[in-house]
Design a protein with these regions (language model features):
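Residue-level "edge-of-site" marker
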Residues: 203, 293, 317
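Short coil/turn segments at secondary-structure boundaries
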Residues: 72-73, 141-145, 159, 451-457
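Buried, small/hydrophobic-residue-enriched core segments of structured protein domains
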Residues: 1-32, 41-43, 79-80, 85-94, ...
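A short helix->loop->beta-strand "cap" motif at the edges of active sites that frequently abuts
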Residues: 288
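Short hydrophobic alpha-helical runs that function as membrane-insertion/retention elements
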Residues: 199, 291, 312-315
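N-terminal, Lys/Arg-enriched amphipathic/low-complexity engagement segments
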Residues: 33-89
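Gly/Ser/Thr/Ala-enriched C-terminal appendages of enzymes
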Residues: 1-31, 44-46, 283, 296-483
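An N-terminal, globular interaction/scaffold subdomain
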Residues: 59-63, 99-101, 106
Length: 483
């Protein structure tokens, strides 16, 4: 687990602290509660999302503390008691954290993270937990869409300079690697997370030398094993590609080396790639790769390939690192249960908008698989329930509760794992490579191709056990009877 040396314990909305002070003042700080983290819709109208950011969430929670500078700042606000500030001086997180494994394919309205902890502990982590999950889940999901659109071709992250800040660049590169990109141009991310780094030259290199031939020659002499030339500084077809070919013949081939690639960063990429490919092939450079960049995303990549653009590598920047087409993931943090006198009481938030009614109580999430290992649904159950696989299992589709529905010949996998117990890490977290491979394995073996479509993907349902559905119905009826 990578360590962030910064103390970011004050990364919270101010109301987290005002509520914490209120709970402390009312002697309720040690009441145990459960909060669920979930999201309501898939980005870009896709069929699923990818869970990212868990490692950073765990690190934040394990290192949560308030130093003298934090206490002094809070005292200066003039609304917090000395007793509360003394309590914060000794504070550390003492609760439990349950979560899906990082890299899991996730779906709307299921609790991806559940925090069970004393009231103050659970309340003050809300903002940071959401910040980390929202950002990395969004970028991992976007990266995976781009990688799938590239259809086996290499995708590289070029996004740092268009990211919204330094953390967005570095952790965005981490999330993009989880989503499937092959490398990043962000050196700090490579150093911090072990992500392969890639990059060759900018237009400034070509412009400094004055002529493309001299620029390419100089680069080839320094990097004969990794000669990739940027060919669009002046004129791709009349200058850039011809000079790249000439340097390959004059400099690289006498050294026994080959031109590794050219990069197109502007213009009609499909047209230019076709013309450049023909020129390279005619010069005996059939093994030279063509890289394209310039505001690419899954939609432009699919279009380029549909046009027959012979592009081998895509460098993707701003539309990946900002998820430009759908830049908000929208995970929320909602209380689900409160412990009173040793018994857990479920809580539910209701709304005029049906999709914003929460799923109450302590619960399990199971992924349901058919005989071939394909995931056919996710299932919410009461905490005590274990699905019986020996016979057909009845379930409720909450949108059509009158239907008699059964899972037959299916297996059930519980998705949430206990990661932190009583404030201590009890489960070793996977490496970044393991997380990345987990994503690939799920998409290859478990998730239906129909869910991976870009247009009108199949919907993966979140069903309920009859007992859990009845719990939710009883709570709704009780609340509406009180109105």
């Amino acid at each position: 687990m990578q360590h962030d040396s910064r103390n970011i314990s004050m990364l919270m909305d101010f109301y987290e602290m005002t509520m914490a002070h209120g709970y402390f003042t009312k002697q309720e700080k040690m009441d145990r509660v459960a909060f669920d983290v979930f999201f309501r819709r898939n980005p870009d109208k896709g069929g699923f999302a990818i869970f990212g950011g868990l490692e950073q969430i765990v690190e934040y929670i394990l290192n949560l503390h308030f130093d003298e500078r934090d206490i002094a700042y809070l005292r200066d606000q003039g609304i917090f008691s000395d007793e509360f500030l003394d309590y914060l001086k000794e504070f550390s997180f003492t609760g439990d954290v349950y979560a899906f494994p990082e890299g899991s394919i996730i779906y709307p309205n299921e609790p991806v993270i559940t925090i069970v902890a004393p009231l103050i502990d659970a309340q003050i982590v809300e903002t940071a937990v959401l910040t980390m999950m929202n950002h990395q889940s969004l970028i991992a999901t976007k990266a995976n869409r781009i990688v799938r659109a590239a259809d086996g071709r290499v995708v590289a992250d070029f996004g740092a300079r268009r990211a919204h800040n330094v953390d967005a660049a570095v952790y965005g590169a981490r999330a993009a690697y989880i989503g499937g990109v092959a490398s990043t141009a962000t050196v700090l991310a490579g150093q911090q997370f072990g992500i392969p780094v890639s990059g060759t030259m900018a237009h400034s290199w070509v412009m400094y030398y004055g002529s493309e031939y001299d620029a390419f020659k100089a680069y080839a002499e320094v990097y004969p094993d990794n000669a990739v030339f940027l060919v669009d500084t002046y004129d791709v077809l009349n200058s850039g590609v011809p000079n790249a070919i000439q340097v390959a013949k004059d400099v690289l081939e006498p050294m026994g080396k080959r031109l590794k690639g050219i990069r197109l960063d502007s213009g009609d990429l499909a047209y230019l790639a076709k013309k450049a490919r023909r020129m390279l092939d005619d010069a005996g450079l059939q093994d030279c790769k063509i890289m394209a960049s310039n505001s690419l995303d899954e939609y432009t990549i699919k279009s380029l390939l549909l046009q027959g653009g012979p592009i081998d590598i895509f460098g993707v920047g701003e539309r990946l690192i900002t998820s430009k087409s759908d830049p908000v993931f929208g995970a929320v943090y909602k209380i689900a249960s409160v412990e009173k006198d040793g018994k857990w009481e479920p809580r539910i938030k209701i709304s005029e908008a049906v999709e914003k009614i929460t799923n109450p109580g302590l619960k399990k999430v199971y992924r349901v698989y058919n005989e071939k290992g394909r995931a056919i649904a996710d299932l919410l159950t009461l905490l005590r329930e274990v699905p019986d696989t020996a016979e057909p299992y009845r379930y409720i589709n909450p949108e059509q509760p009158w239907r008699e529905l059964y899972f037959e010949n299916c297996t059930f996998k519980e998705m949430k794992e206990l990661i932190i117990k009583d404030g201590k890490l009890i489960k070793e977290l996977p490496s970044l490579e393991e997380i990345r491979q987990y994503v690939k394995d799920q998409l290859t073996n478990e998730i239906w191709p129909e869910e991976q479509r870009f247009e009108n993907p199949h919907r993966h349902y979140l069903d309920m056990s009859p007992s859990y559905y009845q719990l939710k119905l009883d709570l709704l009826n009780r609340i509406y009877r009180k109105k």
